Amino acid sequence: MFCVIYRSAKRDQTYLYVEKRDDFSRVPEELMKGFGTPQLAMLLPLDGRKQLVNADLEKVKTALKDQGYYLQLPPPPENLLKQHLEGEGKN
């Protein structure tokens, strides 16, 4: 199984995985509007892989089969102040 990964033109660190290059037919129109013009990031073989860097491999495969796409959102921002205070035992 291969997938094609596109970077969002509107949202930093947001990626859209689809099964075929330039085929967004199964991606909801509202999602595409919010995503912006997709920018090709890479073609990626999924078979034989044990993991992906920022996404759960099984969730990606399941989403591609069931809905035709997978949307990878950026990780939540770090709250450095909270981490610092917790490190000092303060809340």
UniProtKB/Swiss-Prot annotation:
<feature type="domain" description="YcgL">
    <location>
        <begin position="1"/>
        <end position="85"/>
    </location>
</feature>
<protein>
    <recommendedName>
        <fullName>YcgL domain-containing protein Ent638_2370</fullName>
    </recommendedName>
</protein>
<dbReference type="Pfam" id="PF05166">
    <property type="entry name" value="YcgL"/>
</dbReference>
<dbReference type="InterPro" id="IPR038068">
    <property type="entry name" value="YcgL-like_sf"/>
</dbReference>
<dbReference type="InterPro" id="IPR027354">
    <property type="entry name" value="YcgL_dom"/>
</dbReference>
